[in-house]
Amino acid sequence: MIDVIDLKKNFGDNEVLKGINMTINKGDIVVVIGPSGSGKSTFLRCLNCMEDPTSGKIIFEGVDIADPKVDINIHRRKMGMVFQHFNLFNNKTVIENIMLSPVLCAKKDRRKAVVHNMFHKDKLPVHPVKEIKKEAEENAHKLLERIGLEDKADVYPSTLSGGQKQRVA
């Protein structure tokens, strides 16, 4: 569940988001409609912490993810966002495109854990890279199955239709 409480975003003197309040429950389908320049993309970027709000709260699973002290990467793994303009790497297969971000994030966490463990008694788990890739691949196959593209795992984006590319992204 996501609770948005009095979310505001200014760019200089221009107030783009003016105190948005809403609750999005698990399974809800939400459409954000408005004229060009009305703040739709800014709102979505704030929800996914790609843009810092000027004020307000975004409560995701009980945590205010707009709080700068919160490690957003922990929560971002549970979120998804499909952009109007998507980018797939044409030199990578569909499965490699899907695995790329989770593998890079997990490797970054692994490096942080290694450094942490060098200086602290409370040890963090350090997962082998092979395990990270295996888990990412399993999850990617599940996602492809959910969107009906499991037969496209090993093809390149150039062979997909526009709708298929959108679903992969």
Regions found by a protein language model. Give the residues of each.
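ABC family nucleotide-binding domain
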Residues: M1-A169
